[in-house]
Amino acid sequence: MFGTLGAGLSNFPWLSASILFPIGSALVIPFFPDKGDGKEVRWFALSIALITFLITVGSYINGFDINNENVQLKENISWLPDLGLTWSVGADGMSMPLILLTSFITALAVLAAWPVKFKPKLFFFLILVMDGGQIAVFAVQDMLLFFLTWELELIPVYLLLAIWGGKNRQYAATKFIIYTAGSSIFILLAALAMGFYGTEIPNFEFSHLAAQDFSQKFQILCYVGLLIAFGVKLPIVPLHTWLPDAHGEATAPVHMLLAGILLKMGGYALLRFNAQLLPVAHAQFAPLLIVLGVVNIIYAALTSFAQRNLKRKIAYSSISHMGFVLIGIGSFSSLGTSGAMLQMVSHGLIGASLFFLVGATYDRTKTLKLDEMSGVGQKMRIMFALWTACSLASLALPGMSGFVSELMVFTGFVTDEVYTLPFRVVMASLAAIGVILTPIYLLSMLREIFFGKENPKLIEERKLIDAEPREVYIIACLLLPIIGIGLYPRLVTESYIASINNLVDRDLTAVKSAVKTNIFSGTKKNEILKAPTI
């Protein structure tokens, strides 16, 4: 009996269910009555988000083999055969951790949205649609379908910013849609070019595209376009300016989705398309990714240090931390690339926690100006403890996930003999500046908010209250995996190391075809390097 049950579970369409269930359930919300404060809708949305999370966990437990480098849990249904479009979903090591992260963060974002009273039906409808759409981005195995799911999440984010944002919400929402929708045209053009390459019958499946022998010039053209599109979402400096504005106007649950999931779509796509499907071009552009990553780290850290607005300070901190993802993707070692994957998971958890606390603090103080926040630690001691724990995680304290992921990226890049020693030393030294700046601006932020002379106007008028159980629970749920990964990173790395090793081997093979510059080590130009193991 149990064998039959196990076989049935392994054949269950886990990924399709995790995508379609929250979207289909969202369609029920308009039929809820408009009376009251939306209590029924909130409980319904939370139930759907939790069930979706359980479905994704079920997909990992019942059908995913961590030692298998290939796509698993694959479902392939012909959709529009004349256009070469199929409903093709699956998961490998690069997508499964992010699928789990998406459903987990979304469930907590629904709980974070509990105080939302304005248009709750529309708000939770959009959250659930985003849940399914973002899971689809990581699960689809067809490039044209990827483009459609990539675009699907734009409308919910735009509406969540434009309707529930701050006083400059229309500007922030418009800027977001212009940047992201405008850059997405490059994804569509690359998908069509790659799908029709060398054939009159289009095929957009990743497995087909990976087997194609694209010419070097073709790969370079597609790589540049995709780098722009995904660089906007990551974001890469100077394509980042939409993010501080979006974070500056968003509410706490939208913050969590932006920082926890949306930015990771850019990093995942760079790995999936630029590094995996266009390896020859990636071998040539990898040094540029390293440089851009260092620029991200230093520029955003310096800018964050100068910010006096709490939301914008944390937003630039996110941009800085995503620079480590770029360095990891640009390295040709499995340790560095594995560090990039872990950094995406780690920052998803840490970024969501910090932005939730920003929202919770604003709800009490009604200000984001650090100059107006002072001495609230006496009134909000639990909130101070939560802020301290999450800030220590963000500055990569040993024992927390950020320390492990950044150490893996640094070590992987510094020991990567594909690059010359001077290049590695210079880039690592510059990136270290950002590592030094991070604790400075985060600890000074804590000092300005919670210590110093009390602001009588703030203390008396706002009647500050400490963190409530719901808020403590959300942060505890985020800190638990942050500390767990920091103490035992194999909890996550084991799920993707086989896929990462396969990706790195493919890219190292392409190094032979790369443009020979002084950046690449001369002793390694004419041989295929063996990827170091973790």
Curated annotation (Swiss-Prot):
The chain crosses the membrane at residues 12-32, 44-64, 96-116, 120-140, 144-164, 176-196, 220-240, 251-271, 285-305, 314-334, 340-360, 384-404, 425-445, 472-492. InterPro entries: NADH_Q_OxRdtase_chain4, NADH_Q_OxRdtase_chainM/4, NADH_UbQ_OxRdtase, ND/Mrp_TM. Coiled coil: none annotated. Keywords: Membrane, NAD, NADP, Plastoquinone, Quinone, Thylakoid, Translocase, Transmembrane, Transmembrane helix. It catalyses: a plastoquinone + NADH + (n+1) H(+)(in) = a plastoquinol + NAD(+) + n H(+)(out); a plastoquinone + NADPH + (n+1) H(+)(in) = a plastoquinol + NADP(+) + n H(+)(out). NDH-1 shuttles electrons from NAD(P)H, via FMN and iron-sulfur (Fe-S) centers, to quinones in the respiratory chain. The immediate electron acceptor for the enzyme in this species is believed to be plastoquinone. Couples the redox reaction to proton translocation (for every two electrons transferred, four hydrogen ions are translocated across the cytoplasmic membrane), and thus conserves the redox energy in a proton gradient. This is NAD(P)H-quinone oxidoreductase chain 4. The gene is ndhD.
